[in-house]
């Protein structure tokens, strides 16, 4: 199938680009960091190890996936390879979804690799939930990176947009708490700021509820809560894919 061919090409590019070696190096570095923390921690050394390493691997996975996807699609556009691919008897929808499936598969493989070292400090069910959530989160980041990589003309703006979107989604609950602080004096400006923040929050995915470090520390979340998190990520991913397809169909490359 043509789509399967595009998936294989994306995975082959990730392998030839050294993504596997980069992942291995990052895992080794994170394990070394955990060993260092075990020596300096006075109490709760195991909890400190899993919390720091889990947060580090999650952040690294997101930004590695984003940079890989954007660099790949920008290279195809700049080298005119994407134009050559569009000349083939494949619809733009097949072209877009095939690439996205390949990038998402790379993100899922990276997430699985990053979850494995956490088995040294956390229970297997908790690591499994964390890894599944990270896989969905990085797949969503891959969709965002592909959208911004095609929409924006250069690597830096596309990466900045993807990173900014991700960080804003992660930090939005904190921003909402600050905006709704009871210590602030009531005023029309304060009400407008709170309303604006809440409106922006409605447009963003609930990444703050995904891939939580406390899952590794205190056990897996409830089934309904976990399913709600995954459904939110997948639902927002569908919206990003729809926006990407719309832009890709109207764009002249």
Model-assigned labels for residue ranges:
Residues 21, 83, 93, 155-156:
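Residues that define the loop-to-transmembrane-helix transition and helix capping
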Residues 17, 245-253:
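Membrane-interface capping segments at transmembrane-helix boundaries
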Residues 28-72, 96-158, 177, 223:
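Secretory targeting signals
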Residues 71-102:
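Helix-loop-helix units of permease transmembrane domains in multi-pass membrane transporters
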Residues 163-247:
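Terminal transmembrane helical anchor/hairpin motif
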Residues 1-24:
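Aromatic- and glycine-rich beta-strand/loop motifs that create alpha-glucan
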Residues 24-28, 157-169:
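Central hydrophobic cores of alpha-helical transmembrane segments
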């Amino acid at each position: 199938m043509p789509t399967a061919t595009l998936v294989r090409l994306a995975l082959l590019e990730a392998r030839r680009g050294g993504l596997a070696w980069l992942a291995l190096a990052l895992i080794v570095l994170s394990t070394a960091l955990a060993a260092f923390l075990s020596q300096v921690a006075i109490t709760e050394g195991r909890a400190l190890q899993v919390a720091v390493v889990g947060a580090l691997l999650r952040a690294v996975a997101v930004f590695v996936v984003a940079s890989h996807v954007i660099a790949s699609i920008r290279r195809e556009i700049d080298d005119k390879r994407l134009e050559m691919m569009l000349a083939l008897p494949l619809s733009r929808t097949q072209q877009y979804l095939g690439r996205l499936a390949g990038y998402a598969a790379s993100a899922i493989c990276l997430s699985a690799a990053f979850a494995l070292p956490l088995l040294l400090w956390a229970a297997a069910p908790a690591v499994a939930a964390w890894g599944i959530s990270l896989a969905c989160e990085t797949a969503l980041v891959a969709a965002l990176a592909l959208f911004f990589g095609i929409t924006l003309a250069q690597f830096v703006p596309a990466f900045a947009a993807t990173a900014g979107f991700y960080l804003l989604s992660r930090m939005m609950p904190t921003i909402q708490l600050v905006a709704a602080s009871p210590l602030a004096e009531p005023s029309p400006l304060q009400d407008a700021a709170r309303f604006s923040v809440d409106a922006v929050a409605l447009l963003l995915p609930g990444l703050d509820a995904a891939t939580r470090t406390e899952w590794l520390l205190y056990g897996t979340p409830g089934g309904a809560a976990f399913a709600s998190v995954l459904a939110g990520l997948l639902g927002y991913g569908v919206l990003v894919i729809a926006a990407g397809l719309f832009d890709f169909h109207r764009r002249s490359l």
